[in-house]
Amino acid sequence: SCIWQSNARGVDINHNFPANWEEIHKREIASGISAPHNTRYGGKTPSSEPETISLMNYCIKQNFSRCYAFHSQGREIYYTFGDETPKDSKTMARLLARTCNYKLSTPPSIADGGGFKDWFIHRFNKPGFTFEIGKGENPLPLSDLEEEYKILQNILCLGAVV
């Protein structure tokens, strides 16, 4: 069986945002992903999917101070976007990591760009964080979600005051 991480059109929404999309698209092709796929296909163009456009428009209207994206798995936090990483991001990421006992990491090169967090940082020059929740295999077993939620409650509370 394969893990499906894409929308119904075979586009991985977290590879469809206009933030270094061209570079990640080249990496997808080099990895053999050049058409709709169960994972990591960023579409024919950036922002080609209605889900991507909706999330972008929502963030523009809300003027958030930071973004949190939740994925699975690895119990790690991604917070960088190349040279565009906001200066206070590392301090915030360290605090978040200590709060939930996650490690700070860098995404694999095929996933370094084109994502929601990447676009948020690029568009607003504000901190963005991707939390890879849980430990084990994808999909994360439903039985693990309650424990992960308890861990992440502290993050959500901290985010309200920091």
Whereabouts are the PLM-identified features?
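Short amphipathic alpha-helix initiation/capping segments at coil-to-helix junctions
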Residues: S48, T85-S89, S109-G113, L145
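Conserved active-site loop/cleft motifs that coordinate metal ions or position small ligands
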Residues: A69, T106-P108, G128-I133
